[in-house]
Amino acid sequence: MKTRQNKYSIRKFSVGASSILIAALLFMGGGSAQAAEQQQDKGTVENSTTQSIGDGNEKLSEQQSTQNKNVNEKSNVNSITENESLHNETPKNEDWIQQQKDSQNDNKSESVVEQNKENEAFVQNHSEEKPQQEQVELEKHASENNQTLHSKAAQSNEDVKTKPSQLDNTAAKQEDSQKENLSKQDTQSSKTTDLLRATAQNQSKDSQSTEEINKEVNNDTQQVTAKNDDAKVESFNLNSKEEPLKVDKQANPTTDKDKSSKNDKGSQDGLANLESNAVATTNKQSKQQVSEKNEDQTNKSAKQKQYKNNDPIILVHGFNGFTDDINPSVLTHYWGGDKMNIRQDLEENGYEAYEASISAFGSNYDRAVELYYYIKGGRVDYGAAHAAKYGHERYGKTYEGVYKDWKPGQKIHLVGHSMGGQTIRQLEELLRHGNPEEVEYQKQHGGEISPLYQGGHDNMVSSITTLGTPHNGTHASDLLGNEAIVRQLAYDVGKMYGNKDSRVDFGLEHWGLKQKPNESYIQYVKRVQNSKLWKSKDSGLHDLTRDGATDLNRKTSLNPNIVYKTYTGESTHKTLAGKQKADLNMFLPFTITGNLIGKAKEKEWRENDGLVSVISSQHPFNQKYVEATDKNQKGVWQVTPTKHDWDHVDFVGQDSTDTKRTRDELQQFWHGLAEDLVQSEQLTSTNK
C-alpha cells in the first residue's frame, strides 16, 4: 500500500508539475501583458522590461514543450483553471511545490523498470482522459513508445532525478521575475506619486511668487504716483519694462529643473494661465498710465525726460519756404532736401524738434505772429492797429499748437534759416516788449487784444540761432527783389496758387490772395488786382532789403538771458579784378544773384553764399558780437567761423547736385548744433 501511494504521488507529481509549469508560464505571460497595458503611458523603460520578460517566457516555453510533447489541449484547459487559483493563492502553490520536492526525494531509489511502468501508466491515464480520437492514436503508438522508453530507461531515470532541480530553478526565476516586475511597478508608481506631489508644490510656489510680485507691482505703482510730475513718465516706462520680465522668471520656476512636469496637463495649463495673467496685468496698467501722461503731446513737463533737450527746437524756414503739406510740387523738402529729413533725424537721435509752418511771402512781423500761434495754438491775430495800418484782415488761419503750455519759464530753442532768423528775432521782441501801438489802439477803441502784444513774456526763449540770415539785408533784394517786375512776378505766382482747388499756401490769405468758395476765378483775379499788397512795405521782399533789415535792427535788442549764435557760409572766389564770382558747385539758381552781389560797390559786401553777404549773415551791425568758442555766452552774438564752399542752401541740404556737401557732413553739422543747444541750457535754465 505504501509503495502504491508513492507511485501515485510520482504520477500525480508528473502531471501536476507539467500543469503547474505551463500554468506558471501562462500566468507570467498574462501578468506581463496586464502590466504592459497598465504601464503603457509610463515610458519606454516599462515597455523594455515587459519585452524582456516576454522573451524569457518564450524561451522557457520552447524548452518545456520539447519535454512534454504528449501534453495537449485538455491539459492546457486544466492549467488555465489552475492558473486562476494560482493567481489568487500564491502562498499555497509554494507550499505544494515544497511537498512535491520532499516526495520526489523519497523516491530517488526506485528502479528503472518501475519508472518505465509508471511512465506507461502515465500515458494510459492521460489517454483515458482524452477524447476518443486522441485515445486511438495514443494506443496505436503505445508499443513504439514502449520500445523507445525501454531503450532510454537510464536517461529517463536521470531526467526524473533532474526535473525537480530544473523545476526549482524555473520556479525561482519566475518568482524573481514577478518580484522584479512588481518592484518596478512600485518604483514607477512611487515616481508618479512624487511627480504629482512636486507639481502640486510647484503650483503652490507659483501662486505665492505671483502674489508677491503683484504686491511689489502695486507698491511700485503707489510709489511712482507719489513722485513729482517730471519723473512720472520715466518711472512708469522702467516699471513696464522690468516687471513683466520679473514675472516671467518667477512664474515658471520648474521649466528647466523638472522637464517631466510638462507632461502634466493640469499643471501646465495652470502655470500658463498664471503667467499670462500676471504679465498682462502689469503691462496693461503701465501702458494705461503712460498713455494718460502722454495724452497731451504739447505738455513739455510730461515729455522732457524722453529727450536730450529740455527745451523743444523750433525750425523756422525763410522766404519762399514751405512745409511738405502746402509746398509746390516743384520744390524739394525744405529741411534736408533729398539728402535727409533734418527734423526726423533729430527726433531719432533724441532731440525734440518741430518744423514751423508760416507765410512764405509775408513780412517778418506777420510771420512772427503766425509763429507765436503755431507754437501756442489758436487763431492768428495780427492786431487791430496793424491790420488797419497796412490794409489787410486782422485774423488769419488757426493753428492747433505744438506747445500749448508755452509760458515764462517754459522755454524753446528758435533756429531760423535765411529770413527765418529775422523772424525769430521779431518774435522774441514782441514777447518781451509787446506792441505799444496795439496797446494804445485797444485803449482807444476797446475790444480784445492778444497777450502777445501786451509784452512781459520774458524767459520763454532759451536760444536764438541763425543760418545764413541777412541780418543787415541783401543786395539781391535791393537790386532785384523790389523791382516792379520782380514783385509783380512773385505776387502773380502767389495769386495763381491762391485758387480754391490748390493745396499750395503762400501765406497771403489775409491779403485776399485766396479764392472764396462762391467766387469764380475771374472775379478772384479782378479782386486781388486792387489789393494793397503790391505797394505795401508789410512784405517779405521789403524786409529783406538793407533798409528793411535796418528798420528791424532798430526795433529789436539783445536779451541778456538768451544765447545767440550765427552760422555763415560763402561760395564765391575772388577774381583778378577784385570782385567775387560764384563757385562751380554753387546752387545753380543762385549763380546770378551770387555774381550780382560779388560786383557790389562796397567791397566788404561782395563775398556771399549766393543770396546773402558774409558780413550781413554774421550779426546785426548795431548789436554786440564776439567770436564763438567752446564756451557759450548769453546776451551777445557769438559768430562762428565762416564755412567755405557752403552756399545758401547747403545748411538745409536742398542742393542734391552738390557733390562736395555730403549727407554725412550735413548730419554731423546738425548733430553738433543740437548738442550745442543742449549745452546752452545750462546757462539759460531757470531750474538751477
Swiss-Prot record:
Residues 36-302 form a propeptide. The keyword NAD does not apply. Residues 31-309 are annotated as: Disordered. Its EC number is 3.1.1.3. One of its GO terms (molecular function) is metal ion binding. Residues 68-79 have a biased composition (Low complexity). Keywords: Calcium, Hydrolase, Lipid degradation, Lipid metabolism, Metal-binding, Secreted, Signal, Zymogen. Residues 45-54, 144-172, 184-211, 274-289 have a biased composition (Polar residues). One of its GO terms (biological process) is lipid catabolic process. Its main location: secreted. This is Lipase. It comes from Staphylococcus epidermidis (strain ATCC 12228 / FDA PCI 1200).
